């Protein structure tokens, strides 16, 4: 269930002028409560033998502080992996999020979390025209999939510069982790998935039917990621991808 701020934004966008206080009062009267995000849990498995000396550490601003923002879509991206329990075993989900719009521009799901999982997520972003033609920055944790020679070679071949945070430090990949928290509190924890297919379908519907297209995002002044992208394209006279 969405919180009162999200519901207020959605109602206002649909012409229903109402305050967050009023929405909160109505929710209390009806006994409706938003689902709270669960505590962050590290799922990274690093590879101490991986050669990462040429991969840059963090995405920092001119003051040396973490900077997970972007003004141009397709230039700065973040990615991570989470796991979803189903009746037929674990299903692993890798995502790629655009920092300019917070849109999930690529994702991949599989019964294992080997390197092709994360390559396929970035390949989806590339194939859908979501990577800037002059190159992009991709930030992740130090999971073995992201430090593998196969992934590093793929990034180099697609004009992607890798950045990485520290192992086990949640703030270093907070944007990606935040999306997973929303996915699980707003959708996943409401269902008991019998198999991979049912979970795959639900995840796809959540991402494209709700999160990207309709869910208000505070980073976009209340616009959904898709609407934020459209606003950028209209502002600069760009054709929709």
For each feature predicted by the language model, list its residue ranges.
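Basic, flexible linker segments flanking DNA-binding modules
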Residues: 1-71, 169, 224-234
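Mobile genetic element proteins and their domesticated derivatives, centered on retroelements
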Residues: 7, 23, 59, 80, ...
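RNase H-like two-metal-ion nuclease catalytic core shared by retroviral integrases
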Residues: 44-46, 140-142, 148-151, 164-184, ...
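An active-site-proximal beta-strand-loop segment
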Residues: 61-105, 111
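Active-site beta-loop-alpha junctions of metal-dependent nucleic acid enzymes
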Residues: 85, 89, 107-131
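Short small-residue beta-strand/loop micro-motif enriched in glycine and branched aliphatics
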Residues: 101-107, 162-165, 189-190
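C-terminal domain-tail junction helix/linker
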Residues: 156-160, 182-241
